[in-house]
């Protein structure tokens, strides 16, 4: 018989009354008084499950079918028919079923058919993808990534892999994970008692990357338009639903562009993905609407119609001050906008996405282009409702003299960035780029606010299980 997926069935790709084979897991089973069992099967290929009708005349009905419980894996064959009920479009009249795997003790099965809290599901992350919630998120996550790759292919961008292990601190912050093979019980020391990293695997102090941007810029200065996508790491000791120690980042770099170019491009990218998602994942999104009790579809359709607000940092400060709201974090010129400031701006004041630009140079990294006023840099943050900052970007500093000044101001050694500085010495070019936290994008599209539920195996403070 022809093996098919449940998604194939619901795409109307399978002829009614044809004999098919489906492999999957039991969601639930119930018996009728008339000698039938109704088995709900899912295979993860789509949100929908399918009902299978098993007659008690089947040879293994009493020995096996009546003992099927949530989580059992099966391979079944039967006739695809139109359902006479209004809860589903199709059913399968069972001809044959083989149990591939039993649940050892149904009473203690961690993912029973009842609804579980997300807190509990994080404790059984190896099984939680079997639930409707995490399954829907996984499919949406996959399609968002697929859509992003398709967008960049369409826009003639090249994908470039960037290293996960690095000796550079891209963001100039201290929150990095060190990579070392040194014996922790016998660490080699220099005469001044500092660690002798020359004895380490890479011959110098090395870390897990916080960004692939600097490496990506090297390819932007030869291929013109490039992007990368991969895991990044922050050793930030923050145990909240907004932070992960390991998360996925999309980074984009483009030569011969300025701040306005990348602002327009980022907005176009987000709307392309949003439109594709509404077209391809509507069943999963409808489920999440009910789960979160929010109007996700209406919100995303509005997102497609509005133009993002573009506003200078100074104007944002004035809006916050004029609001007369007593924020937890004080508002004054020169502050780094906190999450509450960002969300007030997009959720209460404008109520649509906002691009904040031209930040004080003290708030931003060394590689951001210094504006003519010598006080601000050509940087942007794209803020969206319910999330806050989604994208951070800038026009990169292409002038080596000013780049060196910024490195000095921030206490960074220009010798460590010799190859990055070479880009400014050999055919320098105006270029710009941005980075986007992938899980934050998923959060915006799904309405799921805790970022730990948006990545298969969250890595957080005191948690590296699975």
UniProtKB/Swiss-Prot annotation:
Q: Which InterPro entries match?
A: Aa-tRNA-synt_II (IPR004364), aa-tRNA-synth_II (IPR006195), aa-tRNA-synth_II/BPL/LPL (IPR045864), Asn-tRNA-ligase (IPR004522), Asp/Asn-tRNA-synth_IIb (IPR002312), NA-bd_OB-fold (IPR012340), NA-bd_OB_tRNA (IPR004365)
Which Gene Ontology terms cover its molecular function?
asparagine-tRNA ligase activity; ATP binding; nucleic acid binding
- Keyword NAD found: no
What are the EC numbers? Answer: 6.1.1.22
Keyword Heme on entry? no
Q: Which class of enzymes does this protein belong to?
A: ligase
Any GO BP: asparaginyl-tRNA aminoacylation
List keywords of the entry alphabetically.
Aminoacyl-tRNA synthetase, ATP-binding, Cytoplasm, Ligase, Nucleotide-binding, Protein biosynthesis
- Subcellular localization, per the record? Cytoplasm
Q: Name one Pfam family in it.
A: tRNA-synt_2
Catalysed transformations (reactions): tRNA(Asn) + L-asparagine + ATP = L-asparaginyl-tRNA(Asn) + AMP + diphosphate + H(+)
Gene Ontology CC annotation, any one: cytoplasm
Q: Which Gene3D superfamilies match?
A: Bira Bifunctional Protein, Domain 2, Nucleic acid-binding proteins
Domain of life assignment: Bacteria
Q: Which family does it belong to?
A: Belongs to the class-II aminoacyl-tRNA synthetase family.
Tell me how this protein assembles: Homodimer.
Question: By what name is this protein known?
Answer: Asparagine--tRNA ligase
| Species classification | Bacteria, Pseudomonadati, Pseudomonadota, Gammaproteobacteria, Enterobacterales
């Amino acid at each position: 018989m022809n093996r098919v997926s449940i998604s194939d069935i619901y795409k109307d790709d399978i002829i009614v009354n044809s004999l098919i084979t489906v492999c999957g897991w039991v969601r639930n089973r119930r018996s009728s008084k008339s000698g039938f069992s109704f088995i709900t099967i899912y295979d993860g290929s789509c949100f929908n499950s399918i009902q299978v009708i098993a007659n008690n005349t089947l040879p293994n009905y009493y020995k096996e079918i009546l003992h099927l419980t949530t989580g059992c894996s099966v391979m079944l064959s039967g006739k695809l028919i139109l359902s006479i009920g209004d809860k589903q479009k199709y059913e399968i009249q069972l001809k044959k079923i083989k149990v591939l795997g039993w649940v050892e003790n149904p009473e203690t099965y961690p993912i029973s058919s009842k609804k579980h809290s997300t807190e509990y599901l994080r404790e059984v992350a190896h099984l939680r993808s079997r639930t409707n919630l995490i399954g829907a998120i996984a499919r949406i996550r996959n399609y968002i990534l697929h859509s992003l790759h398709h967008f960049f292919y369409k826009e003639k961008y090249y994908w470039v892999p960037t290293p996960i292990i690095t000796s550079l601190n891209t963001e100039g912050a201290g929150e990095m994970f060190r990579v070392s093979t040194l014996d922790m019980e016998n660490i080699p020391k220099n005469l001044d008692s500092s660690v002798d990293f020359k004895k380490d695997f890479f011959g110098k102090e090395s870390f897990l990357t916080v960004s692939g941007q600097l490496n990506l810029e090297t390819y932007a200065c030869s291929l013109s338009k490039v992007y990368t996508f991969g895991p990044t790491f922050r050793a930030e000791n923050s145990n909240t639903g907004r932070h992960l120690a390991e998360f996925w980042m999309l980074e984009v770099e483009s030569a011969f562009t300025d701040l306005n170019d990348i602002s327009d491009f980022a907005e176009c990218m987000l709307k392309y993905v949003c439109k594709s998602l509404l077209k391809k994942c509507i069943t999963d999104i409808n489920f999440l609407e009910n789960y979160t009790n929010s109007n996700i579809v209406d919100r995303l359709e509005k997102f497609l119609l509005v133009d993002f607000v573009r506003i200078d940092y100074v104007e944002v400060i004035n809006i916050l001050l004029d609001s007369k709201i007593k924020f937890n974090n004080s508002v004054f010129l020169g502050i780094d906008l906190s999450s509450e400031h960002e969300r007030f701006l997009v959720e209460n004041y404008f109520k649509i996405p906002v691009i904040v630009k031209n930040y004080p140079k003290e708030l931003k990294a060394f590689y951001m282009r210094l504006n003519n006023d010598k006080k601000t840099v050509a940087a942007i943050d794209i803020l969206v409702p319910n999330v806050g900052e989604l994208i951070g970007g800038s026009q990169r500093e292409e002038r080596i003299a000013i780049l060196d000044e910024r490195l000095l101001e921030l206490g960074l050694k220009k010798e460590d960035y010799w190859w990055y500085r070479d880009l400014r010495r050999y055919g320098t070019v105006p270029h710009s780029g941005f980075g986007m936290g992938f899980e934050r994008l998923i959060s915006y599209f799904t309405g799921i606010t805790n970022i730990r539920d948006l990545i298969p195996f969250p890595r957080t403070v005191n948690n590296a299980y699975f």
